[in-house]
UniProtKB/Swiss-Prot annotation:
Originating gene: pafA
Binding site for Mg(2+): E9, Y55, E63
Residues that, per the record, bind ATP: R53, T66, W419
Protein's pathway: Protein degradation; proteasomal Pup-dependent pathway; Protein modification; protein pupylation
Name of this chain's protein: Pup--protein ligase
Length: 452
């Protein structure tokens, strides 16, 4: 596909503490967080003026789904806009708590595991053609996705019976299948539930649930950008070496537990190969593909960065990518902290630091602190993120949804929307079905808006 629709859905961890003790249950915190949303949206599941969806997911996890984006750069800005919107809800909820005489601080974490061992995800969505072979797509993608954590993991200190280990990925321990139609019970790498949110005769939505939530914009750019290039190669019929893994679920854990990328995983053919070698194989094909096809600036940046990360892992000198890749940034922070205070990796203060990296509250979260000090690289600007909080992407269906919502709210009209429907809840119950996610202008929607 020359143009592709991308979307990210991020579930956030939530807690409320007072002097280190848990103050409210996650359910109660979530209710406070969403009270403002419910007051104007009459629901804890709403679509916003920027085309995004904000809702309370299973287990009291606030979830933000970006609007449909047709560029990875746009997606990065809209993902960050979601963080800012949730941070606004957090500030509001804390004020309300204090007004009611409840002391405590609310925390929102953009991570993937809590202290009780529960996991929540960052789901990537890629629109693909209905006419390709979905099975082949999965076969080629799974070895890539299993080893992709080497270039875009969020990093995690994992406590094991044999002591603490620093892992590449937070999500790896919680993936139980290769391909499946469930997302919570079995947690596959690729979810096959067929909900394209588009014309089902033309499109499928590839739903990848194996990735970590990233704090660094550049890591997000690489995560989605590299997957997009691999998808384009498959769609273009690029011949790939058969790297089918004997046991993807065992492999994903083995890869996560080895930050050198050298541990061998077994292929279905019986051959053994390292995560680094698998990624190098995909990168070589991707570089050649982008050069031959003449990719855009983002594709060129992705391939260049991908190469630098793999070189850093191969040489063992991670410093050249410490400003760009989450797991490396966090590892360096932890190593400095350990050195300064002479602490083992298993120390509770190290675990606290691991968590603080993902704290969304600017001025308190560790990642936000690094960003303010200019110690990490960016892939979006603050004005772009600010604009994305209110304004949908202008080249996709999200524009139609955002415009419809804005006008309906300004005219105080009752309405219902989802990814494909726009409906005015008046006597006529007029509804427009928007099946084409690439279509940003539609006379039917304009007529519906004009009729308000």
């Amino acid at each position: 596909m020359e143009r592709r629709i991308f979307g990210l859905e991020t579930e956030y961890g939530v807690t409320c503490t007072y002097r280190g003790q848990r103050r409210l249950s996650p359910d109660e915190v979530a209710r406070y967080l969403f009270r403002r949303v419910v007051s104007w949206g009459r629901s804890s599941n709403v679509f916003l003026r920027n085309g995004a969806r904000l809702y309370l997911d299973v287990g009291s996890h606030p979830e933000y789904a970006t609007p449909e984006c047709d560029s990875v750069a746009d997606l990065v800005a809209h993902d960050r806009a979601g963080e800012r919107i949730l941070e606004g809800l957090l500030v509001d909820a804390e004020k309300r708590l204090h007004d009611e005489g409840i002391a405590g601080e609310i925390y929102l974490f953009k991570n993937n595991t809590d202290s009780a061992g529960n996991s929540y995800g960052c789901h990537e969505n890629y629109l693909v053609s209905r006419h390709g072979e979905f099975g082949r797509l999965a076969d080629v993608l799974i070895p890539f996705l299993v080893t992709r954590q080497l270039i875009c993991g969020a990093g995690k200190v994992l406590q094991t019976p044999r002591g603490a280990v620093y892992c590449l990925s937070q999500r790896a321990e919680h993936i139980w299948e290769g391909v499946s139609s469930a997302t919570t019970r079995s947690r596959p790498i690729i979810n096959t539930r067929d909900e394209p949110h588009a014309d089902a005769e033309r499109y499928r939505r590839l739903h990848v649930i194996v990735g970590d939530s990233n704090m660094n914009e550049v890591t997000t750019l690489l995560k989605v950008g590299a997957a997009d290039i691999v998808l384009r190669m498959i769609e273009s019929g690029v011949v790939m070496r058969d790297l089918t893994l004997e046991n993807p679920i065992r492999a994903i854990r083995e890869v996560s537990h080895d930050i050198t990328g050298r541990r061998k995983v077994r292929l279905a053919s019986g051959k053994e190969i390292s995560a680094l070698e698998i990624q190098q194989e995909y990168l070589a094909k991707a570089t050649e593909f982008v050069e031959r096809r003449g990719g855009d600036q983002t594709a060129k940046r992705v391939v260049e960065l991908w190469g630098r990360v793999l070189r850093a892992v191969e040489t063992g000198d991670l410093d050249p990518v410490a400003r760009e890749i989450d797991w490396v940034t966090k590892l360096r922070l932890i190593e400095r902290y350990q050195g300064k205070h002479d602490l083992p990796l298993s120390h509770p203060r190290v675990a606290q630091m691991d968590l603080a990296y993902h704290d969304l509250r600017r001025g308190r979260g560790l990642y936000g602190l690094l960003e303010r000090r200019g110690q990490v690289d960016r892939a979006a600007t603050d004005p772009e993120i600010f604009e994305a909080k209110e304004t949908p992407p202008q080249t996709t269906r999200a524009r139609l949804r955002g415009e419809f919502i804005r006008h309906a709210q300004e005219k105080r009209r009752d309405f219902t929307v989802d990814w494909v429907h726009l409906k005015l809840n008046d006597q006529a119950q007029r509804t427009v079905l928007c099946k084409d996610p690439f279509r940003a202008y539609d006379e039917r929607v304009e007529r519906l808006i004009a009729s308000m």
